[in-house]
Amino acid sequence: MTYAYEVAVQAEAALGEGPTWDAGAQRLIWIDILGSRVHTFDPVSGRRTVMATEQHVGAAKPRVGGGLVVNLRDGVGLYGPGGESSGDSGDSGDSGGSSGPGDFRWLHREVVPGRRANDAAVAPDGALWAGTMRYDEAPGGGTLSRVAPDGTVETVLDDVAVSNGTGWSPDGRLMYYIDSPTRRIDVFDFDGQQVGGRRQLAAIEEGNGFPDGLTVDADGCVWVALWDGGAVRRYTPDGKLDRVVELPVPRPTACAFGGADLTDLYITTARTGLTAPHPLSGSVLVIPGAGKGLPQPAFAG
């Protein structure tokens, strides 16, 4: 099957990541981790917004009541409605940003020198599963934690190098997860809050890059962006490689379905670390009609 890509957002993000379709606002949310920016894009009007954060941001997801939950270097924070267009996260103290709509507050703060936030995802129950990693990507330096809407944090995995893609099967009974240096896409049994029975769904062959972000479609298949692999792959629920989407960039980072009918696959990309010019690296690509995605829950806090 041949896929035709389009450039959704021409950009020069250092480390574009975390595409998320905000169904309530009918827009795409994505981030530049190293640029400390949260971006939004309305594909109908073409309107784009950008919000600067004062810390590296690993993920930004919509909240049920409006605003955003953000996975930041020093913890998880909340922006009120309008927060995507005004206000900054505080780099010191317990709060920051402007007054009024868009106010920022910490939901959970934990300063660990040398560590930063990475990918995150909202589970079917509205909790945030937030990953971390060390800047030097040291094995065992990262974590995956469940952050409840009230701010209660439970560390689920504490022996992680680069915590990355996380997603759930259509029935919510399986959780997929990537720790990128392992080259594996793993699957867990999921009971609504806890995971168990970790096993390998698939592995990326040496020379084909590293698995990064993922999304699960309505058929239960797992789409995985391959960092340094220049492609997105689709795996069936039994781990069979089903499709390969070649891309004009070496470092796709993550993917998510969006659009009114959730059939357009948005793909974020990175420029950081490249030694040769790749004009579209750092932009957001889209493949119209690539498949059928699942509605993504908003954070319940």
Question: Positions of the model-derived regions?
Answer:
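Beta-rich, blade/repeat-based domains predominating
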Residues: 11-25, 54-72, 112-127, 157-174, ...
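Loop/turn-rich, solvent-exposed surfaces of beta-rich toroidal or solenoidal domains
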Residues: 183-184, 203-237
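Blade-level signature of beta-propeller repeat domains, shared across WD40, Kelch, NHL, RCC1
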Residues: 256-301
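Conserved beta-strand positions in repeat-built beta-propeller and related beta-rich domains
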Residues: 23, 28-34, 63, 68-74, ...
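A short beta-strand motif characteristic of beta-propeller blades
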Residues: 4-10, 46-52, 104-110, 152-158, ...
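Short loop/turn segments that connect beta-strands within beta-propeller blades
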Residues: 42-46, 80-84, 147-151, 189-193, ...
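A short loop-to-beta-strand structural motif that recurs across blades of beta-propeller domains
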Residues: 37-39, 75-77, 142-145, 184-186, ...
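Hydrophobic alpha-helical segments and helix pairs
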Residues: 102-158
